[in-house]
Amino acid sequence: MMRYASLAAVACLFATPAFAQSGDTRSDNGFPQNSVSSQVHGGPQGDAQRASIAALQQTLIELQQLQLQTKQAHWNVSGTLFYPLHELLQDHHDGVAKYADEVAERLLAIGASADGRANTIVRTSRVPEMPGGFIDDAQVITWFATNYRVVSDEIGQGIKASEDGDPTTSNLLQEVQHAIDKYQWQMRAMIQPTPTDPNTGADLNGGRPVPPMTRAAPAR
């Protein structure tokens, strides 16, 4: 009898306003949705909290998108550099997965829910999908070298937005940016010209030089 009374007491406790969510932060179209707890939590409050939530949520989405695209390329890359790219992309996938988990947990630590739903990725990521089917190794290299830069630039905005009000979040985002910049270099180095080798990528691209990477438009 005491057991059921205790369970009832706990149920009543969690039904009180103290355990309710204090609100959501979401865009006009409902994505992403980050519920904010009314319970005491770590991290910043007010505007600083909202800035950190936005920075962490966008970083989470881009890392999840990169998880999907690194696997797509890992499976389907074809050409001379199949094996080294196959292995490298697995390493990159594992790295972005690790940081995605840390970013999501930081959202929870500062009192917000993490939105990692498929629809949220589709609607809010600024990184496009890889093409379907088999993918040429030169295409994989330029795709990742370009889009890692897109993600790094976005993370950089989050670092600046959170550095004054939430240095812990800013420091975490700096770690993530460091990893993404390393991955970008590892791709770019495969077609990086040097004083002794123009390294046009033609040997990977049926004798045709790989078009130079263009810097993506700034993140919105």
Regions of interest found by a model, annotated:
Residues 9:
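Conserved ASCE/P-loop NTPase catalytic core
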Residues 3-6, 17-220:
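Iron-associated oxidoreductase/ferritin-like identity signal
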